[in-house]
A protein has these predicted regions:
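Acidic, small-polar-rich N-terminal luminal/periplasmic segments of exported/outer-membrane proteins
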Residues: 35-38, 43-48, 62, 76, ...
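Outer-membrane beta-barrel translocator/receptor signature
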Residues: 207-209, 220-297, 303-307, 354, ...
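Acidic/polar loop-and-plug regions of large Gram-negative outer-membrane beta-barrel proteins
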Residues: 279, 283, 296-363, 376-408, ...
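Structural signature of Gram-negative outer-membrane beta-barrels, strongest in the C-terminal barrel
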Residues: 304, 408, 427-429, 435-439, ...
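Face-selective signature of the C-terminal outer-membrane beta-barrel domain
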Residues: 356-379, 400-516, 597
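Membrane-embedded beta-barrel scaffold of Gram-negative outer-membrane proteins
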Residues: 363-365, 369-375, 379-385, 551, ...
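C-terminal beta-signal and adjacent terminal beta-strands/loops
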Residues: 606, 652, 710-727, 745-790
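Gram-negative outer-membrane beta-barrel transporters
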Residues: 628-720, 785-789
């Protein structure tokens, strides 16, 4: 299917009468199968007028001289055609051009013009330029257009478009933890503009250009990451085109969020962008509220024609109410009203996160480019209130007090070299780099006296009851952890022929960490043993493309995960090496209008740390901190991605994921996990579907509507059972659920309005953290966005 061409039209005027008498010509250019063609340049030689068709293939000439004219239509990939047009005085002449493709040249044109998501070359993860169809693993990209269409205000709403990626927990309302392929991505797998960021906050989406999700192992590029996949948020950059955009969102529960985006050139070599937003909202949960301020300024300097420097800032200030949901009684979620908040009314939290990054891109020549990237991030989160909702069998709960503070700084440096070269008929696409991170984290522990605030019954909680006064907490301990990371890697995508490609890479990683704890009462500092880990992370992928629209692939990669604890010889534990295998197929149909990706995977951790059965002298071990790398987990599954733009204005996305993650080998000693048990918080099935359509013609042109559906299957909350535990069963079964969202919108000139009703069936379910933070999902809500382009 042809979407964008540059054509050359020659217009020959046969008659010319009465120069002062004019009319109007309105027209549309479509392909032989009825699709509008944008970007067509139309020239009228007699009047020296030219115009370009818009996205709908439409054009308009005003004040055109009256008379009969012959138009010759000619362009690469089309048969030459002629048409006669008569322009009458003060009248509008409506015409439609249907261009027939030239079969001799059409084949090549389709490849260049109609690009499917599988074939579109993307610069992903801050520099890796590659077509998804050439990658031996799964990649999904959610662009700003989809984010805007779906009115996403949280990253958790964006990832609803990605199969197998879901919110595993939302502990206390402070953050959202994302899971993929049975693994928690939150600790090390979340990036922004290619830099690892702290996952202790809820990221802002107002500045996002796209969200990239690379499924499977990414240790080759990033070192220590969980094997389920990595997520990278890419923010919008400065533009040398001047413009601005104001967006105001209002919705249920007093939600209000204006966002302003302004950009443009300062001169021929400097451009800027400033994105800012403010959010203020209450919640379907009584007392709970949130207030956020966000700033994202950026400047780009064109030092030379081949050199750019981008400086970007990112700042978020988030005031929020800690909310641990409803809690559980035994093996069941407590049946408390969805709106009931069980915490103290004075509970509060604050998160401040700021980043400054500098990125230098230098093009050495047409085939090679060099990137220098540097970033410093500061993170500060503090909250206090009642926590951990764990009532007894009749609902009585002694509300415990808690106060926590975390201060973190991450300094990151990256150097990447990317280029292409050939050896004979073999093409190489190389991506190599060196990276280093230094993370300093301080965790402050506070104590209350007494530790219990009061006692309530969760089924009969009255907000009007007078609460005890807010107690003061004393800082008792500060634990500081310093972690240094260094890695060097190289990757080569080798094109052996048009049908065969090989992706080979290797990374060496070094990681060093140490903790020291200051006990404030006696002013004593205890320093832990220094932990050092090194690991090689290889990657090998084979790609077979029997046709230009089919790609069969298989791959092997591994990753490493540092462990805590010591060996029986009082040494630090080695990192666990985790192996991952994938096979799959990527297929385009109907000239790229429909793309499908199917992936099968298996992830094996044969070095799972578990309590050692015996000590070095052969005696029975009772210290759970003494461990061996003798356990095993297996995660295996299937993922299906579907994407289609069957007609102009219609976008359809769908996905399905199956995952089975269990303990495949355990020691059986007291405290070890039970062999064959499924890991908690890992649903077997997830699915997603979205459809968005904008009318292209007629009186209702630019009217749009959409539907979004997301399914999370049955899963287990609580904790996994262990051998020798005193409690019969620590797991809590959680049912699956489906959520539907509907939206409708209209665009008129520079103004657009879009309204979304989310969770239209008012489904009730929960995101779960262990057994004490059961947070209900939001009920039916309405959100309206008003947007104006300057």
């Amino acid at each position: 299917m042809l979407t964008r061409y540059f054509l050359f039209f020659t217009f020959l005027s046969i008659f010319s009468v009465f120069a002062q008498e004019t009319g109007t010509i309105k027209g549309k250019i479509i392909s032989s199968d009825g699709f509008p063609i944008a970007g067509i340049t139309i020239k009228f030689e007699t009047s020296k007028i030219s115009i370009i068709t818009d996205e709908s293939g439409e054009f308009e000439f005003q004040n055109f001289p009256v008379g009969t004219n012959n138009i010759a239509l000619e362009g690469v990939g089309f048969k030459k055609q002629f048409k006669e047009i008569k322009v009458n005085k003060n009248e509008i002449s409506l015409i439609e051009f249907k261009l027939e493709e030239n079969s001799i040249t059409l084949k090549e044109i389709v490849i260049n013009i109609k690009i499917s998501p599988n074939k579109k070359k993307e610069s992903i993860f801050s520099g890796l330029d590659i077509r998804p169809i050439d990658m031996p693993q799964s990649l999904q990209i959610i662009g700003s257009k989809i984010i805007q269409q779906q009115q996403s205000i949280r990253l958790s709403e964006v990832i609803k478009n990605v199969n197998g990626l879901y919110v595993g927990s939302a502990r206390g309302g402070a953050q959202e933890s994302f899971w993929s392929r049975g693994y928690d991505m939150s600790a090390t797998n979340i990036f922004k503009n290619g830099f690892r960021i702290s996952s202790g906050s809820i990221p802002e989406v107002a500045s996002l250009e796209k969200v990239e999700i690379l499924k499977g192992s990414a240790a080759l590029l990033f070192g220590e990451v969980a094997p389920g996949g990595v997520l990278n948020m890419v923010t919008k950059l400065p533009s040398f085109k001047r413009g601005a955009e104001l967006n105001v969102q209002v919705g249920s529960f007093a939600f209000y969020k204006p966002t302003f985006d302004v950009y443009g050139p300062l001169n021929k070599k400097i451009a800027y962008r400033l994105i800012t937003s403010y959010e203020n909202s209450e919640s379907f949960r009584k007392i709970v509220k949130r207030e956020r301020i966000y700033l994202n300024p950026s400047v780009v300097f064109k030092v030379k024609s081949n050199t750019e420097i981008t400086i970007q800032g990112d700042y978020l200030n988030d005031l929020w109410t800690p909310d641990f949901g409803t809690g559980s009684i035994g093996k069941e979620i407590a049946k408390v009203d969805r709106s009931t908040y069980l915490g103290a009314s004075w509970s509060n939290g604050k998160t401040a996160q700021s980043t400054v990054s500098v990125m230098l891109n230098h093009k050495l020549n047409n085939n090679w480019k060099l990137n220098f990237n540097s970033s410093i991030q500061n993170f500060d989160r503090i909250w206090e209130g009642t926590e951990r909702i764990q009532p007894n069998n009749i609902g009585d709960w002694n509300r415990p007090l808690g106060k926590y503070k975390i201060v973190e700084q991450i300094i990151s440096e990256q150097i990447n070299l990317q280029g292409c070269y050939t050896t004979g008929k073999i093409k190489h696409q190389v991506f190599s780099g060196i990276d280093a991170d230094k993370t300093t984290a301080e965790a402050y522990t506070f104590a209350f006296n007494p530790t219990i605030y009061d006692t309530i019954n969760i089924f009969d909680f009255n907000y009007s009851n007078v609460e005890p006064p807010k107690p003061e907490a004393i800082n008792t301990r500060i634990a500081q952890t310093t972690t240094n990371k260094f890695g060097i890697f190289t990757q080569d995508l080798i094109t052996i022929s048009e049908k065969f490609k090989v992706l080979a890479g290797l990374r060496w990683s070094f990681q060093e960490g140490q903790s020291k704890t200051l006990t404030i009462v006696n002013n004593e500092t205890a320093t832990d043993q220094k932990r050092k880990n090194t690991a090689f992370s290889p990657k090998l992928g084979l790609v077979f493309q029997p046709t230009k629209n089919i790609s069969l692939f298989s791959s092997y990669a591994n990753s490493f995960s540092p462990n805590v604890g010591i060996t029986i010889n009082n040494e630090t534990l080695d990192a666990s090496i985790i192996d991952q295998y994938e096979i799959g197929i990527k297929k385009d149909f109907w000239n790229g209008r429909f793309s499908s990706n199917i992936t099968f995977y298996q992830i094996i951790n044969s070095d799972l740390a578990q309590t050692a059965e015996f000590l070095a002298d052969g005696s029975i071990n009772t210290n759970t901190n003494i461990k061996t790398l003798s356990g095993e987990t297996i995660s295996k599954g299937l993922e299906i991605d579907l994407y289609s733009k069957p007609i102009e204005g219609l976008t359809i996305m769908a996905g399905y994921s199956y995952n089975d993650m269990l303990f495949s080998k355990t020691s059986g000693v007291i405290g070890s996990f039970i062999e064959g048990d499924r890991l908690t918080r890992t649903p077997s099935n997830t699915a997603n579907f979205s459809l968005f359509y904008s009318l292209q013609y007629g009186k209702l042109k630019d009217l749009s509507f959409g539907i979004l559906s997301n399914y999370i299957g049955k899963r287990v909350g609580g904790w996994n059972n262990t051998n020798g535990q005193t409690i019969p069963d620590r797991t809590i079964p959680i049912s699956g659920y489906t959520v539907f969202d509907l939206s409708i919108g209209y665009k008129w000139k520079q103004i657009s309005i879009l309204t979304k009703i989310s969770n239209i069936t008012n489904t009730l379910n929960y995101t779960v953290h262990e057994n004490y933070s059961f947070n209900p999902i939001a009920p039916r809500q309405i959100l309206t966005s008003l947007n104006y382009l300057f």
